[in-house]
Amino acid sequence: LMVHEVLGVKIALGDHRSSFPTTQNVLDLLTQIRVGGMIAGKIGVLHIHLGNVTGAFEMFEEIVNRGFPIRHIRPTHCARDKYVFSKALEFAKRGGRIDITTGGSCCFESPADAVEAAWDAGIEPSIMTMSSDGHGSVPRFNEKGEMVGLGVGGVACNLRDLKKLIARGHAVEKVLPLLTRNVARGLGMKGKGEVSAGNSADLCLFD
C-alpha cells in the first residue's frame, strides 16, 4: 500500500479456484490492509472475487461482528447467483459496498435488472457500483463442468447497462455514479469521480 497506485489486495472466496482461506486468514489479511492504509493515508480495501460456493458472506458477517470495519470488505460479482445476491443485499444493508459485474454470470436477465432489484430492496444507491471485469479471463465449461476453453472479458458492458438503466427512466444523476463517484469515494480517490472545481478533468462525451 506504500506504492501510490496500490489501493488494496484482491482474493477469491467461495470459488472452486480459490485457496479456501479460513475466517482467521481473511481477518489477518484485512488487518494488514487496514494498518497499511492508515500508514499510507489510504482506505485500504480487500477486493473479493465471489464464486458460487457458499460461505463468503457468512465469513464477512463473523468478521464484522467481531468489530472489524465493514468498509474495507469489497465483494464483487454480487449478482452471480440468487444466493450470492440475497447475501449481498444483507451485507449492503449493514453498510457494506457491493459491486454488480456487467460482464459474466448474472442471475438476472441482465445486470441492469440486478441493479434495479437492489434499489427496489432499499439498498442505498451510493454504496453500489458496476464493473465490467474487462480483460479478465473467462473460462468456458461444457455440460459436465469441464473447462473447454478460455476467453477474455469485454469492456463494453458497463456502457451497455448504463444505457439500459437510463432508457428505463432512471435519472442520469442516479445511474452515472455507479461508474464514477461511487467508485472514487469507495476507493478514497480524491479529486476523481465527479466534475467539480479542482478535480481531475476525466471526461467522456456521449452523443
Predicted feature residues:
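Metal-cofactor-binding active-site regions of metalloenzymes
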Residues: 1, 5-19
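Sequence-level motif detector for i,i+2 pairs with an aromatic at +2
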Residues: 4-6, 70, 125, 201
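Active-site core of metal-dependent hydrolases
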Residues: 17-20, 25-141, 146-152
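His/Asp/Glu-enriched, well-ordered alpha-helical/loop segment
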Residues: 120-199, 203-206
